Amino acid sequence: MWKRIGMLLLILPLLVISIPVGPVSAAATFSNPVIHADVPDSDVIRVGNVYYMTSTTMHMNPGVPIMKSYDLVNWEIVNYVYDTYANTDSHNLNNGQNEYGRGSWASSLRYNNGVYYVAFSSLSTGKTYIYKTGNIETGPWTISTLGSYYHDASLLFDNGRAFLVHGTDNISIVELNAEATAVKAGGLNQVLITNASNVAGSNFIVKAEGAHIQKINGKYYVFLIAWPTGDSRVQITYRADSLTGPYTGRVVLRDSGIAQGGIVDTATGSWYALLFRDSGAVGRIPYLVPVTWSDNWPVFGVNGKVPLTMNVPVEGYPAKKIYGSDEFNAGTGTGSVQQLLVNSGFEDASLSPWTSNNTATIAATSSEFFGGSKSLLVSSRQQTAAGVKQVITGKVTQGGVYTFSAKVKYTTGPATKTFNFSIQNGPSYTGISIMGSATLTKGQWGTIQGTYTVPANADLSQTFVFLETPYSSNPDPANDLMDFYVDDVSFNTTAATGGTSTGLAKFWQWNHNPDPANWSLTQRSGFMRLTTGKVSPSLLEARNTLTQRTFGPKSTGTVAMETAGMKDGDYAGLAAFQARYGFVSVKLSGNAKSIVMANASSGTMTEVASVPLNQNRVYFRVMCDFTNQTDKAYFAYSLDGTNWTTIGNTLQMSYTLPHFMGYRFALFNYATKSTGGFVDFDYFRVE
């Protein structure tokens, strides 16, 4: 059947499927899974007649999606909690490091006294983060960092106090201050439930975790999952009359592994749970489960089973999706991040438009670099302000807010040294401001980063940014005027408001932290331009891979791409992305282009098929079949967007724990020899 459907897709023009925005009423019934896509670890709240949900997206950014619904069935992504939350080698895919399968996990979403809170822990940093905002759909968010990792933490606000419930098997509680910004000194800190798994069995693949604590009608409920050996995952509930217990527990759902999550009520008093099920390569997909009550215990499902067809809890709202097509026409609006510096990674050895500041010598070098293959060496310094600068006159505005970052390294001199990232507004040195500083360790790359607001009365007739060491009227050559290296410098615009500022449709996420210098929706109007900023051995190490979820039971993604800007050794195209990925791409070898299908299902990327390409515009298609966990992907290309040809072999998709994520459609461009090549994506269309 799929082959016949696939052939129709290859010979018929693609019908553009977009997210409905008109007043189209949803059906009175729906079928589970409620979202046939990767949405694990969900947490749902209701505020008035609106439901909000968060989920785990780990190494994808922006991170922790905020999804919105009026009926618990039709969901759309309206915001993210952060653009990025850390700036390390693993987050940036540098020096062979990554955070696949780690990143942000199992967020907790709460609303208390007019403020929205999101808490999550990170396996990458070993810390727990709490974000809060007064407007969950636009932000801005403020962040508090807890120095400890609290596994699968769940927030609770109770009688003016704040808590986190967390852990595996032995479920613990720690008290926060009333603002939920730090652990409260001397506050409650104890185990709530010992051996919480025991109500589900004696041997386990995964012991009880995924805590969700809620106070309902004066009682405290802790919802957990466990995975007994020889069984599927089960939903557990513990109940107590007081916060510290004692708690009694039971298994409340044992059905096909559907588990993990709390419960939420409707305005009319009905109750539901959004729980997920491991479902092969498409990922961990959510089911909407009815919940009733018996003797103050929640009863999940109907006769112990999750219904496959149900009435929509609240009727009359339009259909929504968390995936969609994109013509890339929205990038000229406000709010998109723009990198204001050129040649920020110094891969162009001419260094233009960088120049020396005061008396110094600057040169590109490959002897030291943080990202890509080159950095900039500053030497022969005569003053502490001597360094490297770039003029940005006309690019900034009075009152404008900008983020900045630079990697700096020095190898001679004192054990530690402070470096400044500075700006000069106007022709006089009196307009100099130190935007940010960092104390670096000799022999190690360090980061100077922060946010800078241009003064409302700044003289913008001349503006430049530069890197320096702190001022000294009598600088010591060894301790103040040492040579230093600079790499990956950024000075970016920010959104005027909002939690995130990518300028992209909300269904898109980058694989790891994006490099804002090397993607653009404005360099060519109506196109997404991806430029290579580092040399990468494979797709898994490449930055600025743009992804969105595949979905079941079948989904097809199509791109139109223009390739005139590619360089020798570049690969660019469309992938079915996970650890065992496959793609169809253009490959440039010397001056010869070819269309290549690659398959990495064995763990190693193999080029399976190749055909010559003698034009700049090309169309690619990836077709995914998740029916009954068939988990196969097929690849095709077209030279005119109408007539399609299959290429290569079938990718047997597999859900792997190193990535711990369902397959995604991925637009990519990566360099294997030299940087600076670019491609322009005209559209991505999904059905």
List where the protein language model places each region.
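Short non-domain terminal segments
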Residues: M7, A28, L155, D326, ...
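Hydrophobic alpha-helical segments, especially transmembrane helices
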Residues: R4-I5, S375, T550, F665
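Carbohydrate-active catalytic/glycan-binding domains of CAZyme proteins
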Residues: A26-Q338, Q444-T447, A458, S490, ...
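Bacterial N-terminal signal peptides that target proteins for export
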Residues: M1-L9
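Sec-dependent signal peptide cleavage junction
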Residues: V16-T29
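Extracellular and organelle-lumenal recognition/adhesion modules and their flexible linkers in secreted
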Residues: S336-T500
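Hydrophobic helical h-region of N-terminal Sec-dependent signal peptides
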Residues: L10-L15
